[in-house]
């Protein structure tokens, strides 16, 4: 049986998604190669996530908004994308307490309203452009970069020698020399994002010295190393580092 969830970087089970929906009252059938979900009458409840999964938190939030009563989500992910989704649901008329923390309280069951909403800039895309700058050198101005949500990324970039100046709506960055060696570890927000690990691996491959990068989220995220080695990079991978 093959279910959604998973890709070349590692296992991405959907068990937490299904558990949250079941606890809210959804009827879920898993048969053959398909999952059928019926959600006629969702009821608010207490949800406890064993891992701060971004996707499971998002699904729980949206289902809780439609459920009657109060839902408390313990162990919620704290990524900026969760906060943005909460603000979007708030704009539609859902009351949510604890935004930005690991306990979210959703007062659901109200009729949702039409709304116009602006999605902020993507922190991973911004980090990718900055990583490209560190390899190529030169100067870069990123308009619309979500600087408030990039502390972990900017710390790593500065450690490697990138000069970054922050403004309310942009980042000005300059790279004058080859990157310096770095020592970083991935983790849930606000730590360094796993989605930028392969970018920093490319940066480390041209750095002046030995870097150490630890991956704590996805077990196959270092597959990039093999491709960089084909291009001449000196990389060894041992036990997630």
What is the predicted role of each segment?
Residues 1-241:
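Structural preference for solvent-exposed beta-strand-turn elements
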């Amino acid at each position: 049986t093959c279910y959604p969830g998973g890709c070349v970087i590692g296992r991405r089970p959907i068990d937490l998604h299904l558990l949250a929906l079941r606890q809210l009252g959804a009827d879920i059938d898993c048969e053959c190669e398909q999952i059928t979900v019926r959600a006629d009458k969702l009821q608010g409840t207490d949800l406890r996530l064993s891992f701060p999964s971004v996707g499971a938190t998002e699904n729980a939030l949206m289902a809780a908004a439609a459920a009657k009563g109060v839902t408390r989500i313990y162990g919620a992910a704290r990524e900026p994308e969760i906060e943005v989704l909460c603000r979007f649901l708030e704009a539609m008329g859902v009351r949510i307490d604890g935004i930005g923390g690991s306990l979210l309280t959703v007062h659901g069951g109200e009729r949702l309203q039409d709304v116009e909403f602006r999605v902020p800039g993507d922190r991973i895309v911004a980090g990718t452009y900055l990583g490209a700058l560190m390899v190529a050198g030169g100067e870069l101005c990123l308009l619309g970069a979500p600087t408030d949500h990039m502390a972990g990324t900017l710390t790593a970039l500065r450690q490697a020698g990138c000069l970054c100046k922050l403004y309310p709506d942009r980042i000005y960055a300059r790279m004058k020399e080859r990157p310096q060696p770095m020592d970083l570890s991935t983790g849930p927000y606000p730590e360094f994002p796993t989605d930028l690990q392969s970018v920093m691996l490319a940066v480390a491959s041209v750095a002046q010295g030995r870097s150490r990068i630890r991956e704590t989220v996805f077990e196959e995220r270092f597959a990039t190393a093999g491709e960089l080695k084909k291009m001449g990079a000196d990389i060894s991978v041992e036990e997630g580092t």
